[in-house]
Amino acid sequence: MESTAPCICKDSNCTKIGPPGYSGILGDKSVEFLRDPAVFVEKYCEHHNSRVFLTRLFMKQTLVIADHKLLTKFLSHSHEHFYNGLQDFSDLFGHNIMFARAEEAANLKRILLPLFGANAVESYQTVLRDVLDDWSRNLDLNNSVNLYEEFKNISLAYNIHIFMGVKKADDEEFFRSIKELSSAHWHGVTSVPWNFSIPFFGNGGYKKAMGAKKKLLKIIVERLSSANSSFFEEFRRKNDGEISQELLYNHMLLFSCALIPKGVGSVLAMFFEMGNKWKHLLSSDGKLSEDDLDCVLLEVIRMFPPFMGGTKVASEDTSVGDYHVPAGTAVYYSFMAAMRDHSAFLYPEEFMPGRWKKVEERKKNLGFGTGLHGCIGRHLTWNCIKEIINYTMDMFTIQFPDKCPPEVKILPVLRPKEPHGFTMIKKYG
């Protein structure tokens, strides 16, 4: 049903229609949104009979996009007229490619992409194998295993080795310290971005996160000056003086923090939680072919993207699809909703890995984002995820949960609400 709402540009002479919905000051729906973003988006898509609608979130007029075609176009063409809606949290990570405007982001991407390319990823294989060998040797199989936590730790150990040049097996205390600080830093993402405490309420999560950030940066600077991080040396060499020292270290913070491990842990946990849905694809020796593994992973990410979506804010009067969008308007886009859009996916609520058999269809998966601010480390992350799966299935017999999918928590990263305790038996020795 086509919207009959007036255009939100407020120009009395404008003949365009506006998106369905209401964004009045008294209609803020932040509490309802935070309760369950996925349910919120689908509820109002159904209410307005539209995959694009207007609402008010966090005291800001917000256009919500759950339409796959429009979202793909928006992510590919919005960088000139929008800035990252998490700009208020930029102090938490320092200025980096996530918050950079178009020209700077393009330059940073040019420098960074080769560091995460196929050749670079290949050189990190030995590092990941060492981390996995150390993990399997020390894994307690007498009790059920929380794979979400295990895979987060594996990813963090891998990142610390690559980006800081420190082996977890050689310095367990250092790993524990980074893990603790990364956790405190990460929790700032779900806190109000105020760097102060409120009387009687103690220290705010954001203040603690900022403290953790300072400690992490100090450790990163100290370690990179003494440890052998080939990644950092290559990063410093390739930028040819175009990037300041502060910006270099801000990116090393981004790569070393909990963001990547939580995303990796999310995908891997949901992959194994959904085991009963794809175990029929296993060969007689308990393996997935590379193509089947790709298809299953793409379907896991389609249904359960680790990061549900994002927000951009219009820096000037512009348009999104058929709608005018005034400066200051937020655009919230939902990867989860867009990848369950009936106009883009047949039976979107069904787990169907076969939908990804055609390689040309795979570009429809938005789990890593797309456009200028799409994930620069997608090749490294994809390779890491597949290697961990293959290693785990080679080394262990795993009993999958009878019931799937599990209930999930979505914010700040998707993961099982009650992670299944996996029974794992070593195949060798």
Residue ranges, per PLM feature:
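Conserved cytochrome P450 K-helix E-x-x-R motif and the immediately C-terminal K′/meander segment
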Residues: 28-49, 286-323, 329, 342
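Cytochrome P450 catalytic core segment centered on helix I
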Residues: 176-243
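N-terminal membrane-proximal hinge/A-helix region immediately C-terminal to the signal-anchor transmembrane segment
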Residues: 2-93, 134, 364
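Cytochrome P450
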Residues: 2-13, 43, 56-63, 84, 94-130, 139-161, 170-176, ...
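Central I-helix of cytochrome P450 enzymes
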Residues: 159, 216, 220, 237-287, ...
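Cytochrome P450 heme-binding "Cys pocket" and the immediately downstream C-terminal segment
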Residues: 379-414
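Conserved cytochrome P450 K-helix/beta-meander segment immediately N-terminal to the heme-binding cysteine loop
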Residues: 80, 333-359
